[in-house]
From Swiss-Prot:
Involved in acetate metabolism. In combination with LdhA and AckA, allows fermentation of pyruvate, enhancing long-term survival under anaerobic conditions. It comes from the Bacteria. InterPro entries: DRTGG, P-Actrans_bac, P-loop_NTPase, P_AcTrfase, P_AcTrfase_dom1, P_AcTrfase_dom2, Phos_Acetyltrans/Butyryltrans, PTA_PTB. It holds the Pfam family DRTGG. One of its GO terms (biological process) is acetyl-CoA biosynthetic process. Its main location: cytoplasm. The lineage of its organism: Bacteria, Pseudomonadati, Pseudomonadota, Gammaproteobacteria, Pseudomonadales. NCBIfam families: PRK05632.1 (NF004167), PRK09653.1 (NF007233), pta (TIGR00651). It is found in: Cytoplasm. Pathway: Metabolic intermediate biosynthesis; acetyl-CoA biosynthesis; acetyl-CoA from acetate: step 2/2. This is Phosphate acetyltransferase. The keyword Acyltransferase applies.
Length: 704
């Protein structure tokens, strides 16, 4: 599926018109299209509905999600809730994209009150993994100045050489004055721009060049009445007639006659009987004036209106306002040029006109090109929460009175991410909640370990009888809440376990290895971090468990990590990381990675696995082409397997801090049932996502 993000280069470029035309062009190509306007930008005094979504619904019959109100967006941005905002937008986008081949996403328009629009558009395009089409309108500028302005905007999204930045559509283009007609003038403009602009190459192209058409901007006479809150003396055809030109008449009739042409709105004081009569005579002679607008609060003489009856019955609209000529003209100048949501005729004409000036063959070819979607960080977080909510699993938290854990459990319970079980004394949990201002939602389970501990003694002895465990020893070990929670998991009373906010990694994993054991086909437990980089999610393993894995261990970690990536919608291209690429180096460490690569390929010949690869060769396309030109993984790796814990843990923390990215994990792999360890510095958000990951693992491991 393709997602096209339509981004304006400035104010007044006609963004909605371009969206309408693109949708029509895509429909002509036989594609199932969707439309999404993430954020509503209503003009002052505009009470809605949001214009773009409503026009798309009326012209294309699409059910579009309701955009977020601008006030809500500004509040979330002001509160530093950009991630939450993007997740909410992705939730709406999923509705628009359901069962579609291509989705048009319309970005924000920069205005005096929304100077942050460009930054928001950047984050929206990245989060939706969208291909960007810029929309610009030439102003009074040279071709060089126009090109520079477009390139500056393209740089916001990665530059014109970024494969996701497709090109530009120029709207409202006025051709050369000496051209035979407007179409020829615009064609000549497009040719000169393409020939002389270094910006417009094959990888950044001119996708469309839309000529300026006065008639497409013509408002209905009724729209003028609404704008001015005018009194309607005679409605006539004011729903159908369009204002092509406004003429302020203060001169004598002989000097006015030549101005009375089709589509003209005549503005004159209400006591200018001569102008009123002249306009009426013109109308009765077949000139379809847009209407008469009488100003200065002078009501027309009834006798004059009686003389004009033929014109009025013929459909001539007559409006009246209290303001004088100057103020009326000023108010008319403030007319919003956008298409009203109920003007279906104008919307259809604009849609067809724009669609006819889009490079249809290129658009069809682009949509027919398969494209691997990258999972952006907000999309990953959204997906994790959605899948956890759908799983509905019961997750035990043995550190039940730890403040961060209590808050995370409350969030997960309230959002339906998991059915959380806090293992702690109820009065301690209540005290923490009161001190932290946490509202404990209904249904949040709190189990006092002292009241249930005894019933796990016998089952634990049975599980560990081969290791010489007796009842007194079991009772002593069950004093540890992590051991008690692990027994609950072993007996299938819960679906997963999350611990580590105050316990060490060993304290979390050891009971799991003793009581849960490894999953069939696995000999060890490892871990991965999901690294939420700005434009994609990568998987790092192992960064938390195995200090110095052997070649066979490393191969197993690679296979486990690839499976984890695929389980969360990330295509698995596995890079076995070393200080050397290919055959360029030798030594014990690089030989271990080389052997691990061979073993992993033997175990899973269906996976893309390559190594040894240096990190830059694995991650950066240009370096990968130079250092490992024949590698199926180099430059596009999604799963990074580090040779030891020292390298893995150092790298994950360095990337996390230097790239200022969120990491989710560690998520443990290889256990028969999901147990996950937290960093002791984990934030509440980290715990929430770890609980969600655990719920998804439990769902994946559940018997069919």
């Amino acid at each position: 599926m393709h997602t096209f993000f339509i981004a304006p280069t400035g104010f007044g470029v006609g963004l909605t018109s371009i969206s309408l035309g693109l949708l029509r062009a895509l429909e002509r190509a036989g594609l199932k299209v969707g439309f999404f306007k993430p954020i509503a930008q209503l003009h002052p005094g505009d009470l809605g509905p949001e214009r773009s979504s409503e026009l798309v619904a009326r012209t294309h019959g699409l059910d579009t999600p309701k955009p977020l109100p601008l006030a809500q967006v500004e509040r979330m941005l002001g509160d530093g809730q950009l991630d939450e905002l993007l997740e909410e937008i992705i939730s709406l986008y999923q509705r628009a994209a359901a069962d579609k081949d291509v989705v048009i996403v319309e970005g924000m328009v920069p205005t005096r009150h929304a100077s942050y629009a460009a930054r928001v558009n950047f984050h929206l395009a990245k989060s939706l993994d969208a291909e960007v089409i810029l929309v610009s309108a030439p102003e009074n500028e040279t071709l060089t100045e126009l090109t520079d302005r477009i390139e500056i905007q393209a740089q916001l999204f990665g530059g014109p050489r970024d494969p996701k930045v497709l090109g530009v559509i120029l709207n409202k283009v006025r051709g050369e004055a000496d051209a035979a007609n407007a179409e020829d003038g615009v064609a000549d403009f497009a040719r000169r721009l393409t020939e002389h602009s270094p910006l417009l190459r094959d990888d950044f192209r001119l996708i469309g060049c839309i000529p300026w058409q006065d008639e497409l901007n013509a408002a209905r006479t009724r729209d003028i009445a609404d704008l001015l809150s005018a009194r309607v003396i005679n409605a006539g055809d004011y729903e159908q007639r369009r204002v092509q030109k406004i003429v302020l008449c203060a001169r004598a009739v002989p000097n006015t006659v030549q101005l009375l042409k089709p589509g003209v709105l005549v503005v004159t004081p209400g006591d200018r009987d001569d102008i009123i009569l002249a306009a009426s005579l013109a109308a009765m002679n077949g000139v379809p004036l847009a209407g008469l607008l009488l100003c200065s609060d002078f009501p027309p003489d009834p006798r004059i209106m009686e003389l004009c009856r033929g014109a009025l019955q013929g459909g001539l609209p007559v409006l009246s306002v209290a303001t004088g000529s100057y103020d009326t003209a000023t108010n008319l100048n403030r007319m919003n040029k956008e298409i009203p949501v109920d003007d279906r005729e104008r919307a259809e004409r604009v849609t067809e006109f724009v669609a006819g000036h889009i490079d249809f063959e290129w658009l069809k070819q682009r949509c027919g090109t398969p494209r691997e979607l990258r999972l952006s960080p907000p999309a990953f977080r959204y997906q994790v929460v959605q899948r956890a909510q759908k799983a509905g699993k019961r997750i035990v938290l043995p550190e039940g009175s730890e403040p961060r854990t209590v808050q995370a459990a409350a969030i997960c319970q309230a959002r339906g991410i998991a059915r959380c079980v806090l293992l702690a004394k109820p009065e301690e949990v209540q005290a923490v909640a009161q001190a932290q201002g946490i509202v404990l939602p209904e249904g949040l389970e709190i189990i006092d370990p002292d009241l249930v501990r005894q019933r796990y003694v016998e089952p634990m002895v049975e599980l560990r009888k081969g290791k010489g465990l007796n009842a007194p020893m079991a009772e002593q070990q069950l004093e540890d809440s992590v051991v008690l929670a692990t027994m609950m998991l072993a007996l299938d009373e819960v679906d997963g376990l999350v611990s580590g906010a105050i316990h060490t990694t060993a304290s979390t994993i050891r009971p799991a290895l003793q009581l849960i054991k490894t999953a069939p086909g696995y000999n060890l437990v490892s871990s991965v971090f999901f690294m939420l980089l700005p434009d994609q999610v990568l998987v790092y393993g192992d960064c938390a468990v195995n200090p110095d894995p052997s070649a066979s261990d490393l191969a197993e970690i690679a296979v486990q990590s690839a499976a984890s990536a695929q389980a969360f919608g990330i295509p698995a291209r596995v890079a076995m990381i070393s200080y050397s690429t290919g055959d360029s180096g030798s030594g014990v460490d690089v030989d271990k990675v080389r052997e691990a690569t061979r073993l992993a390929r033997e175990q899973r010949p269906d996976l893309l696995i390559d190594g040894p690869l240096q990190y830059d060769a694995a991650a950066i396309a240009s370096v990968g082409r130079q250092k490992a030109p024949n590698s199926p993984v180099a430059g596009q790796a999604t799963v990074f397997i580090f040779p030891d814990l020292n390298t893995g843990n150092t790298t994950y923390k360095a990337v996390q801090r230097s790239a200022d990215c969120v990491s989710v994990g560690p998520m443990l792999q290889g256990l028969r049932k999901p147990v996950n360890d937290l960093s002791r510095g984990a934030l509440v958000e980290d715990i929430v996502y770890t609980i969600a990951l655990t719920a998804i693992q439990a769902d994946a491991q559940a018997p069919a």
